[in-house]
Curated annotation (Swiss-Prot):
<protein>
    <recommendedName>
        <fullName>Iron-sulfur cluster assembly SufBD family protein MTH_1150</fullName>
    </recommendedName>
</protein>
<dbReference type="InterPro" id="IPR000825">
    <property type="entry name" value="SUF_FeS_clus_asmbl_SufBD_core"/>
</dbReference>
<dbReference type="GO" id="GO:0016226">
    <property type="term" value="P:iron-sulfur cluster assembly"/>
</dbReference>
<dbReference type="Pfam" id="PF01458">
    <property type="entry name" value="SUFBD_core"/>
</dbReference>
<comment type="similarity">
    <text>Belongs to the iron-sulfur cluster assembly SufBD family.</text>
</comment>
<dbReference type="InterPro" id="IPR055346">
    <property type="entry name" value="Fe-S_cluster_assembly_SufBD"/>
</dbReference>
<dbReference type="InterPro" id="IPR037284">
    <property type="entry name" value="SUF_FeS_clus_asmbl_SufBD_sf"/>
</dbReference>
């Protein structure tokens, strides 16, 4: 099996991605694992790193957190776990501990998807395994979230990570992931492969905040397998400048009455190119999906907002919604909603709208004493501050705090 995987990866080494600008991987440094010193607690990382972690929802003090994983460049430097109902560890550790884990690798994401997945697999074969393993035990319902951070601290580094998350039957798991760069980093590449497996009756909420440097390129590759009566909720926030990001996670609702929700908040600034979307394949009877995105473009940014709902069996439901605000003549939002139905008795719909700030709203706020700039900023923040559904009250409040912090620059 490993040999077949590596053969596929080798053949796809130069394979361009379907979407997004092609990246020359040779211009980045392939740093070895173990280059950074390990710490026993998150609060032991340098002060300037702690401040960056807070901006992406990762608390160095680990207050109300069930566990923590931090990867700097290619090195897993911190792993803690405060709960007996879940497991969190580096993938290199998990593969040594569990021989069965390799059976989950490259099942939700094909290794030959493109050059980025292929490069991740080839680096793994060379011993440069990055990423985390998270598992909730059967019946476990952890109240506090786990937190994970992918941090790039060195210039021109290529960071690869292969994450696997397993929610066993009737378990519930909440994860906050923050991705960021150090203050001295201007350019780098992050490639994150993430595979989620939700067993019968399981539930995962996954909230991700990105805060990259202006010349960082980002290529996440994500697949989600959703079993009977399972629910996966994904919240994504990006409002800081980045050179380019291209992400198109795909969820497979193979289980009966399975459910998937994708909610994205995108703020394009400066020369950023954001090619974002999500795809849900509804293959189990009674399965459903909801995909909602809010996008704002300013300066000379470009946003491609994609969504694809595919109903393959009867009695499935799906809704796709994309709303965008264009704030400058040099910026652009390109909405691409797709509905695909290949069975009877299904319900799928989409709603897309791209426009500008309403002048009457600005006039109303300026009449109340705000400047035009303050009024526009308030309207934008209100537009992007959509309600994040599906979270426990404590985590919903934490997510709102993370969102408010992200929107300060908009």
């Amino acid at each position: 099996m490993l040999r077949d995987t590596l053969k596929k990866a080798e053949k796809a080494r130069e394979k361009k991605a379907l979407y997004g600008e092609d990246i020359d991987l040779e211009k980045f440094i392939k740093e070895e694992a173990g280059e950074h010193e390990e710490v026993t607690r998150a609060k032991e990382v340098p002060k300037e790193v702690q401040e960056t972690l807070l901006r992406v929802g990762v608390d160095p003090e680990e207050r109300e957190r069930a566990g923590t994983f931090i990867q700097v460049d290619q090195s897993g430097i911190c792993t803690t776990c405060a709960s007996e109902s879940i497991e969190i560890m580096g993938m290199n550790v998990a593969l040594d501990k569990y021989s069965w884990l390799k059976d989950y690798m490259w099942k939700a994401v094909a290794v030959d998807t493109d050059k980025y997945t292929a490069t991740t697999a080839l680096r793994e074969a060379e011993g440069e395994m990055g990423g985390y393993f998270i598992r909730s035990k059967p019946g476990a319902r952890e109240v506090f979230p786990l937190q994970a951070c992918m941090f790039i601290g060195d210039e021109r580094v290529m960071q690869t990570a292969h994450n696997i998350v397993i929610a066993e039957e009737n378990s519930e798991l909440h994860i906050i992931t923050g991705c960021a760069t150090g203050e001295d980093v201007s350019s780098a590449l992050h490639v994150g492969v993430s595979e989620f497996y939700l067993k019968k009756g399981a539930r995962i909420t996954f909230t991700m905040v990105h805060n990259w440097a202006e010349q960082v390129e980002v290529r996440p590759r994500t697949g989600i397998m959703v079993g009977d009566d399972a629910t996966y909720i994904n919240n994504y926030i990006l409002t800081s400048p980045v050179k380019s990001i291209q992400s198109y996670p795909t969820a497979y609702c193979t289980g009966e009455n399975s459910r998937v929700v994708f909610q994205s908040i995108l703020g394009g600034q400066k020369d950023s190119v954001l090619d974002m979307g999500s795809r849900v394949i509804l293959e189990g009877r009674g399965s459903s999906a909801e995909m909602v995105s809010r996008a704002v473009s300013k300066d000379s940014s470009q946003i491609y907002s994609r969504g694809h709902l595919a109903g393959r069996v009867p009695e499935v439901k799906g809704h796709l919604e994309c709303h965008g605000l264009v704030l400058s003549d040099d910026s652009m939002i390109y909405a691409v909603p797709e509905l695909e139905g290949s069975a009877t008795e299904l319900e799928m719909s989409h709603e897309a709208a791209v426009g500008k700030i309403a002048e009457e709203e600005v006039m109303y706020l300026t009449s109340r004493g705000l400047t035009e700039e303050e009024a526009a900023s308030m309207i934008v923040r209100g537009f992007l501050s959509m309600d994040i559904t599906g979270l426990p009250p404590e985590l919903a409040a934490e997510t709102k705090r993370m969102l408010d912090m992200s929107l300060k620059g908009m």
